[in-house]
Amino acid sequence: RPTTEGIFKSLDGHDPLGALQDIDLILDIPVKLTVELGRTKMTIKELLRLTQGSVVALDGLAGEPLDILINGYLIAQGEVVVVSDKYGVRITDIITPSERMRRLSR
């Protein structure tokens, strides 16, 4: 007689091993990390007047933490550092791993 044991997942909702295996499936998926220095709004006229050497003022204050986004969702804040002659960011505040996964699954 055929059996379905091992084919279908348990419906009781208590499968911690399955949850770990599910997360292993997504661990190598690339995500986009963005560090945001600040934002501003401008008119089309102002945009068209920009030239090399133009300075655009942003809403972020000097010394204020920078927003760190993953796929457009805020997950942390940090400060600018230099790493081997390149910019980097030191994380100063971050949401929990479970909250990060929840935001990415939206």
UniProtKB/Swiss-Prot annotation:
It is found in: Cell inner membrane; Bacterial flagellum basal body. InterPro entries: FliN, FliN-like_C, FliN/MopA/SpaO, FliN_T3SS_HrcQb, SpoA-like_sf. One of its GO terms (molecular function) is cytoskeletal motor activity. It holds the Pfam family FliMN_C. It is a peripheral membrane protein. It comes from the Bacteria. One of its GO terms (biological process) is chemotaxis. Disulfide bonds: none annotated. The keyword Cytoplasm does not apply. Transmembrane segments: none annotated. Its main location: membrane. One of its GO terms (cellular component) is bacterial-type flagellum basal body. Keywords: Bacterial flagellum, Cell inner membrane, Cell membrane, Chemotaxis, Flagellar rotation, Membrane. The keyword ATP-binding does not apply. Belongs to the FliN/MopA/SpaO family. FliN is one of three proteins (FliG, FliN, FliM) that form the rotor-mounted switch complex (C ring), located at the base of the basal body. This complex interacts with the CheY and CheZ chemotaxis proteins, in addition to contacting components of the motor that determine the direction of flagellar rotation. This is Flagellar motor switch protein FliN. It comes from Pectobacterium carotovorum subsp. carotovorum.
